[in-house]
């Protein structure tokens, strides 16, 4: 089993940003050119990227497709993309840019059977479902709406519909650089057989080890590598040993 590191490139208004718990206006990082940042992570050895269109996720306005095409065209790395993908045409448009995998959040939660249809059309490996959890409950609409479901029951449902992987985000620790709580990840991993990528609060090499020990197939790292709290090269070297 390999453990993959996904540096995060979050897009907001044409810039590369990092928010605290996904709250608009809480930027702790705001950089002019997302492509420059993506190239930087690739130059450090990253062979995976996690790109989120925050304009799409928060406001439903997907304005960053040109930036996405530039990143995909420039780099030969595995790219997964989410944020504001709310229709079949959105899925087709994003996959048409050349990305490897789309992340379905609100769309999947509104209409779970669509996951099965998309997995059959594009293949399970290209369809990831996002389970973003706050206080034990799954959220939608860019983390702004809390649902009466927990991640485990939904994870089982989406696996049965053919999702190839799950992105599990712990919003309670997202963007705070205070470390991870591996137990919710472990519980989800034990309930499903498809890969689970963990996100939220990864800020040290120990956090990466904890998530690997919990059974995660990889981790998204954002704020910590932008602020220098965590060295991406060291994280990538550690991942090779897990």
UniProtKB/Swiss-Prot annotation:
TM region positions: none
Intracellular or extracellular location(s): Cytoplasm
InterPro entries tied to this protein: Aldolase_TIM (IPR013785), His_biosynth (IPR006062), HisA_bact_arch (IPR006063), Isoase_HisA-like (IPR044524), Isoase_HisA-like_bact (IPR023016), RibuloseP-bd_barrel (IPR011060)
One GO term of the biological process aspect: L-histidine biosynthetic process
Domain of life: Archaea
GO cellular component terms given for this protein: cytoplasm
Keywords of this entry: Amino-acid biosynthesis, Cytoplasm, Histidine biosynthesis, Isomerase
EC number: 5.3.1.16
Pathway(s) served: Amino-acid biosynthesis; L-histidine biosynthesis; L-histidine from 5-phospho-alpha-D-ribose 1-diphosphate: step 4/9
HAMAP family listed in its UniProt record: HisA
UniProt-recorded name of the protein: 1-(5-phosphoribosyl)-5-[(5-phosphoribosylamino)methylideneamino] imidazole-4-carboxamide isomerase
Originating organism: Methanothrix thermoacetophila (strain DSM 6194 / JCM 14653 / NBRC 101360 / PT) (Methanosaeta thermophila)
